[in-house]
Amino acid sequence: MSKSLSWDDLKCEIQPWIRTAIESMGFETMTPVQASTIPLFSGNKDVVVESVTGSGKTIAFVIPILERLIKEEANSAKFKKSHFHSLIISPTRELASQIHDVIEDFLKYYPDNLYPIRSQLLVGTSSASVRDDINSFTDNRPQILVGTPGRVLDFLQKTNVKTASCGTVVLDEADKLLDLNFQKDVETILKMLPKQRRTGLFSATIESAGAQIFKTGMRNPVKVAVKSNSSAPSSLSINYIVIPPKDKLQLLLTLLNNYRFKKCIVYFPTCISVTYFYAFINHLKELNLIQDDLKLFSLHGKLQTQSRMKTLDSFTSNLTDAVLFTTDVAARGIDIPDVDLVIQLDPPTDADIFIHRCGRTGRANRIGKALVFLNEGREEDYVPFLEVKNVKLEEESVELKGVENLTKIFHDWILHDRARFDHSVRAYVAFIKYYSKHTASSIFRFHSMDFIGVANFYGLLRLPRMPEITRYAADQIPEEGWLVSPPVNLDTFAYLDKQKEKARLQELQNLKQISDKKKLKSELKKKNMAWSDKTLTKEAKAERRAAMAIKRKAIEEKLLRGDEESEDEVEQDWKDLVRQNKKKKHNSMQGSFDDL
């Protein structure tokens, strides 16, 4: 079932204003998942919905929620104070915000003469506390709540909020919500809601949730699985490029400079990698080595919520060519118009996330392309591994046409500020830890990782001291770990930030003073030792050496004479010799202490 259908063919009636809203938003036809889900979820069925990314799952649950809410309003005039009707939970703030925006877009067409329907977004922000959410809930009396698990749980636990009237709950990206990171909060929330309710689970990879599905309190759920020859939509092509780690940055710059796209999302493995490469590639842009009209954005989970929302809104509404550097915080569910290229510098630790990342492009039957970089060798086995999950990848080759003298430019940029040197090391260490936790460890083997190649990708001047590197790549480590020649004088390598540099110099001075004190103390100890003690020490050592020599000579003579003494006895003599030597040494040391 791959073709789109007319809204006239929907097997249930929907409100005229909802139909107007759908057409005004440009959804002239419905997708298979919408045609299958809306009639079931609008009625009295719990649903488990699995469909490829970009297939319209959000609208498939928003319309039933609105339909059920309108029926409830008609039957009970209006909801009691402190009660709500529907709850939608998503794993990220960005996705929750997007779902809330979709609901608000529908409500723009809601008739003014009817009792107002309102929605409220519940996500943690630095500017809004749970108390602020409660005040807004009390004042506006919304019937639909949309939020992330932690904030929703905090909200529902307040005495001002009553859950008895909640008739519908939706878990969007349900497999993520039911994994170990969110499972406890989600199960607690579900236990607080009425048992007589409608529950909907939605995801592109719902099967990975396994037995956890049965803990959501559904009653005889209907599974809606839209069949496809691939886990990705037909409008999306997924390709891989085999490239050594040291050339990954050059390949990325080649694609950004030469590939035609309107919007591109580049996925990095860690938050610090995003900020690090965002800063450096902006530097290349200032040098006119990246196309001038390309606008860069960065987004990751360590940013404040308001900053994340603002960045996402800016990237979404940007009219010129734009690139978003991000982590998996922007991998699930987020619908950004006009994204026609997705680049993954490294495969994610979870194969399901790979599908979600790719699904940010090729949405709603638009043409999209997803690329993933794989290291030469073992990592190429990732391709057949994904085929088992019904994801087919085609190899692609790209001629490197990035930036000349890139390594020198990279190192010069780092040498301009010691903070960048620190940043490069932290980014490298974070990646090492990330790679070591890969779930497909049979493919992404930590011990066979190209530690030096990855270090070159991150522009490292010197390898950090890490047990992982010492254990698996000791033979690859250059002298003192330096990857540049000549080595950098770390005593004079300064921070641009005056306060940080002042603190560094102070610490350097303190360390020098401590070192000088230790050196002076050692010299004084040697200098102040009594001449008689020195003589006794020398004489004791000479006596031990002489005794050892006599014993050794006696044993050697035994062996030469061929005495009938067994090998065990000879070995025992050697052991006695060593034992006596240790005992004398111990007694000598003990005597020195006793004399104090």
From Swiss-Prot:
Protein name, per record:
ATP-dependent rRNA helicase SPB4
Give the species this sequence originates from: Kluyveromyces lactis (strain ATCC 8585 / CBS 2359 / DSM 70799 / NBRC 1267 / NRRL Y-1140 / WM37)
A GO molecular function assigned to this protein is:
RNA binding
Q: Which gene encodes it?
A: SPB4
Pfam family of the protein (one)? Helicase_C
Q: What is known of its domains?
A: The Q motif is unique to and characteristic of the DEAD box family of RNA helicases and controls ATP binding and hydrolysis.
- Purpose: ATP-binding RNA helicase involved in the biogenesis of 60S ribosomal subunits. Binds 90S pre-ribosomal particles and dissociates from pre-60S ribosomal particles after processing of 27SB pre-rRNA. Required for the normal formation of 18S rRNA through the processing of pre-rRNAs at sites A0, A1 and A2, and the normal formation of 25S and 5.8S rRNAs through the processing of pre-rRNAs at sites C1 and C2.
> What's its EC?
3.6.4.13
Which SMART domains is this protein grouped with?
DEXDc, DUF4217, HELICc
